[in-house]
Amino acid sequence: MAVVMDGVKKNIIDRTIPNLVKKFQNFNNDDIAYFLKLLHETGIDLFEINRDSMDKIKKFPLNLDYIYRIENIEDYNYLNNYNFKYIILNYKTIYRFLLEDEKIQKNLKEHNIILEIDIEDLDELYLSEDNKIFCIFNIVCLRINNLSKLDFIDEDFRIKDLKSKFNVLVDFCASNKYNMATAIIINAFLNGSDIITTEFNSNDYAAMEEVIIALKSIRNIEIRGDLKLISKLTRIYEKITSERVYSMKPILGEDIFKYESGIHADGIAKNPKNYEPFNPELIGTNRKLYIGKHSGKAALVVKFKELNLNCNNIDMNLFLQDIREKSIQEKRNVLDNEIIEMYKEYNKSYQR
């Protein structure tokens, strides 16, 4: 699985698991395994985990590629038990491992390392004349962390310069401090980043679902995965967390493709692109027309077609009036089965 732009394969790292582990205590291993499986089939290549993840989740799917974060010596103890694709070391803490015994240093040198560095420390790395860590460790990727604004000047040039100067791949992990993480990650992707780091349904980082749907629907980037699984991902995520995803959450919310007003309904019937940035079928769901007190005749005609009802058999204006009255009386929309029952009653009265 991967994302392909102009024939170049790029990878996506998912870091959902560490944040789930941080927020919640108990997990069903089968649910976690299914969640990771769906993420992989959606198009995620690499899964970031840490020691807390390993402590609380006893069984990870073996056919996936994992990245292991090491922040201290206690984290190191898990390193030899699993075959990790990469390990993550932070720029501020990597030097402490040079003070450890030679056995630990030697072991770390045998692994492919993603060096994570906060954006504010990047100049320090650039200006350092003695970047011995690049000689000592096998650093294959540089992750730019905590980028919170679209102010990475001459981003295309900077990314190329990073690759050239340090002979590494470049990964971006943006902070959502100013609600710009998704835009930052998309911009980095389009400007040469080899890897992007996201999180499912995230408020802290770039939301995975927003990034891949934006790349697909706006830029028509090739996503080598089944995006229709996103609706299933949402359901298993809700099961794991015992929390409902916000109903109007972009991409994931269950109400984002619901509509009622007459003009809206008529417009979608004629051309959905007037109202929808992408077809709901792309993510394995459907649009839903609700009929209620705000609905007009055009919306009712669309609903009749949806329910295979013949609008020529009855007085649609009178039927609409009854629909509105029922909606006001019940203080909600009128359900499909109720519309069908009302239609049957109307037909009976016409036949008498």
Swiss-Prot record:
Question: Is the keyword Transmembrane assigned to this protein?
Answer: no
What enzyme category does the UniProt record give?
Answer: transferase
- Name-wise, this protein is Homocitrate synthase, omega subunit
Q: Which Pfam families match?
A: HCS_D2
Organism the protein comes from: Clostridium pasteurianum
For this protein, what is the EC number?
2.3.3.14
Q: What is the annotated role of this protein in its UniProt record?
A: This protein is a Fe-Mo-cofactor biosynthetic component.
GO terms of biological process kind:
nitrogen fixation
Q: Which residues form the signal peptide?
A: none
Specify the superkingdom: Bacteria
> What's the miscellaneous note?
In Clostridium pasteurianum the N-terminal and C-terminal portions of NifV are encoded by two different genes, nifV-alpha and nifV-omega.
